[in-house]
Amino acid sequence: MSKLGIDIGNYAVKTSTDDIFESKVTEVKNFGSDSDSIKIGNKTYYLGEGDEEINIVKYEKENFLPLLLGAICRNTDDEIVDLGLGLPVKQFAGLRKNLIEKLQGKEYHVEFTRGNETTKRDITIRSIQTFPEGVTGYLYYAKDIVDQIAGRDVVLVDIGGKTTDIALVQGNKATDPYSINVGTINIYDAIKKSLEMDERFLGKVEIKREKIQDYINKGFYLNGEKQDIKKNIDASISLFKEIYNELKLNYPVSTAAVVVMGGGAKLLGEAFKKNIPGIIVMSDVDKHVFANAKGYKK
């Protein structure tokens, strides 16, 4: 029996074992692909490929079950699993029972393929625990920033794949939840659009969303020369303003500790730091991206 925390976001699936893959599935294998696949019933799904599927209620997405079972198969050989899963703070009270009833006690007969090896699996989800997204990840790493928090209430800003969830955290309790339809995907798309419309690159290069983070981290090269794309990256600032205006109007950002986390923390971190003195940006992608999943397991 294994216990796993699985964070199924709109952009990526993360697990408590430090595994991550894109929240995409397709029934048509891409040429030359070496992606893992999972067969459920008479359908085979290739993980991490295809198009994103966006739904405010994540567990109602058609790709939810292939992503969940795929994450289980990728991370444990055990047949019986206990799972920790998350819901947005605003949905937690109303939907947690539905999520538990959807999965708890269910059995799934699947075939999982990695490379040239295919295994038949009979997976039983013995139990489901649900947790509020963002808050759980923050509490998991709170010990690392306890001196910066200094006993204050916390305004938590969790920038996910397609939404930003905000809540006021007092002790271990979250109140005043609010969700904005701005996330990492929107940020990447804004930068992508700016690059595509830039006359320097027009018609010369194909810009792919999945490469945007590499361009930010490693630079954008054309014909062997590194290009200055600061203004293109700054095209996402208007999205920051949507989040900032909500914080400024409805949360005690001048007296509380403001903590930004999630996949978009690194992307918008500098903009936050310029506008909110003393803000804590949890932007260590290799570490903090797994915060929710690790908190769900704990």
Predicted regions and their residues:
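Short amphipathic alpha-helical segments with coiled-coil-like heptad repeat character
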Residues: G94, R200-F201
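Short, acidic (Asp/Glu-rich) active-site segment that either coordinates a divalent metal cofactor
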Residues: L156, T163-L168, S179
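Flexible, glycine/charged-enriched surface loops at secondary-structure junctions
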Residues: K204
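Long, charge-rich alpha-helical interaction segments
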Residues: K193, M197-R200
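Long, well-ordered mid-to-C-terminal structural blocks that present hydrophobic/aromatic surfaces
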Residues: L168, N172, A190-K192
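Nucleotide/phosphate-binding catalytic cleft detector across ATP-hydrolyzing
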Residues: M1-V154, K173-N186, I207-K298
